[in-house]
């Protein structure tokens, strides 16, 4: 039997929004099948043909390319307007995007400015499970394309009922939009798993905006990487963890719960700095601690929800799974994914592994990984408390003193590079420009300040092909 439609009133005044299933009355292409329709394929083809004409900043400087570019932009704008009946909740955005494309062409394809259409795109207002969006912007993709080329993406909202209840209660996060891929252009055939407004070409960045995370990509690469890593390390997976690796849908919902709590944590707690750390230049291990703090907060809250007597069965089950997801993604995927150049997520994964090992709840013995599961929660939560204590104390510290204290926290557990000036102490003082501006501190951080341990060096070699295979991965494969 088909599920009953999920209906919600749109916050922007349009007609009610219908989630799964959604079928147009005239029997033509519906948003349920749009990814295989000639309309979408035509739009995708036009976008893909336009991209090679652009340069890094998104402009098209070659006059000889302008006739072709104008024809492609005309096709794109026409498709955007034609999609309005399929995506009535995005009507304002689709029309505004068509206008932005046409303005870009009429102004000679200078650096694109899609601020107006970005302002019209408000997916956080309509978080309905199964609701679909068509997104077309000139943009770079985080951990993907560094050029602001036009991208076209079809996405679907993931908003299970238990997450809606959590968000309406203690875990409010009104700008958080979890989504899954339906189809995309080349900028997302990469490791990028986010859609953030600040990546879009525009004249100014809005102050507060939504953030979308591709939970299907997160879940799919987690399942592939952890399955391989657990086999290599001969880790005996608990039944619930194995269930998570076997079920993409369950993994997606688990990552949505994790991301919901992680994302809101950036704005909460005793913060000694502006929450928008991305705008600040500082030693990259500060980012390691902030991202890890948010993940460990999600872990701690998952433990609390699992243990609370009034937690419903569905939420309790997912809370248990969030704990496995945070732990395994951090120690198996984060630590060995990406280059060793200022890899702040890598350092966070290394730190969690070493912390667990040095607190003797994780063991690498006889070439087998063993985890004392009953003791893990308190040890993980203790690391979170260490970071929170650092933050609380640093409210009263100057910036560089906070940086030094943060380095001490990390280097107590992770061994720095032997050539590190940060680690070297001369005449009782760190070998840093202590009397100079903060820039000198940041410049002194090595690109790989905390190299991989011998355990991780060996694991990364065995895992390299699997890690590489996750680029472009979605819940569909």
Q: Where are the regions that the model predicts?
A:
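Extended, compositionally biased alpha-helical segments that mediate assembly or anchoring
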Residues: 6-158, 397-477
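Long, well-structured alpha-helical subdomains associated
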Residues: 18, 24-29, 37, 252, ...
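Contiguous, non-catalytic segments that form substrate-binding/exosite surfaces or channel walls
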Residues: 81-242
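C-terminal interaction module
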Residues: 156, 160-188, 359-452
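Short pre-active-site segment immediately N-terminal to the catalytic Zn-binding motif
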Residues: 241-258
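Active-site recognition of the HExxH zinc-binding catalytic motif
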Residues: 255-271
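Post-HEXXH active-site segment of zinc metalloproteases
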Residues: 270-292
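An active-site-proximal "capping" alpha-helix that borders the catalytic cofactor pocket
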Residues: 286-304
């Amino acid at each position: 039997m088909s599920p009953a439609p999920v209906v919600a009133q749109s916050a922007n005044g349009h007609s009610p929004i219908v989630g799964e299933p959604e079928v147009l009355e005239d029997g033509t292409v519906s948003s349920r099948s749009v990814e295989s329709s000639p309309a979408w394929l035509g739009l995708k083809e036009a976008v893909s043909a336009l991209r090679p004409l652009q340069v890094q900043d998104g402009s098209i400087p070659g006059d000889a390319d302008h006739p072709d570019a104008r024809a492609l932009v005309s096709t794109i704008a026409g498709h955007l307007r034609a999609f309005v009946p399929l995506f009535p909740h995005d009507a304002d955005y689709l029309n505004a995007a068509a206008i932005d494309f046409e303005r870009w062409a009429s102004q000679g394809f200078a650096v694109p400015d899609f601020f107006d259409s970005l302002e019209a795109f408000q997916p956080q207002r309509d978080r309905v499970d199964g609701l679909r969006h068509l997104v077309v912007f000139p943009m770079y993709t985080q951990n993907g394309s560094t050029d602001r080329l036009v991208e076209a993406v079809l996405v679907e909202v993931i908003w299970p009922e238990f997450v809606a209840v959590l968000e309406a209660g203690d875990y409010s996060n009104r700008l958080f939009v979890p989504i899954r891929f339906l189809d995309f252009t080349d900028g997302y055939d990469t490791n990028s798993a986010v859609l953030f407004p600040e990546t879009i070409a525009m004249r100014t960045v809005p102050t507060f905006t939504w953030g979308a995370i591709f939970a299907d990509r997160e879940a799919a690469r987690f399942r592939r990487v952890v399955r391989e890593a657990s086999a290599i390390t001969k880790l005996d997976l608990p039944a619930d963890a194995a269930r998570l690796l076997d079920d993409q849908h369950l993994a997606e919902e688990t990552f949505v719960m994790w991301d919901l709590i992680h994302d809101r944590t950036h704005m909460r707690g005793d913060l000694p700095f502006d929450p928008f750390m991305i705008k600040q230049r500082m030693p990259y291990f500060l980012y390691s601690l902030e991202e890890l703090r948010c993940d460990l907060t999600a872990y701690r809250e998952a433990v609390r929800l699992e243990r609370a007597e009034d937690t419903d069965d569905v939420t309790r089950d997912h809370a248990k799974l969030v704990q496995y997801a945070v732990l395994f993604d951090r120690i198996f995927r984060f630590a060995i994914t990406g280059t060793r150049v200022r890899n702040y997520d890598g350092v966070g994964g290394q730190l969690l592994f070493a912390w667990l090992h040095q607190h003797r709840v994780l063991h690498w013995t006889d070439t087998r990984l063993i985890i004392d599961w009953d003791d893990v929660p308190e040890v993980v939560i203790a690391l979170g408390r260490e970071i929170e204590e650092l933050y609380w104390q640093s409210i009263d510290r100057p910036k560089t003193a906070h940086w030094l204290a943060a380095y001490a926290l990390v280097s107590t557990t992770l061994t720095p590079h032997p050539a590190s000036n940060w680690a070297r102490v001369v005449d009782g003082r760190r070998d840093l420009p202590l009397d100079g501006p903060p820039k000198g501190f940041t410049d002194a951080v090595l690109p790989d300040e905390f190299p991989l341990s011998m355990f991780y060096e060996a694991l990364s070699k065995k895992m390299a092909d699997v890690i590489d295979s996750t680029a472009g991965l979605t819940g569909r494969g």
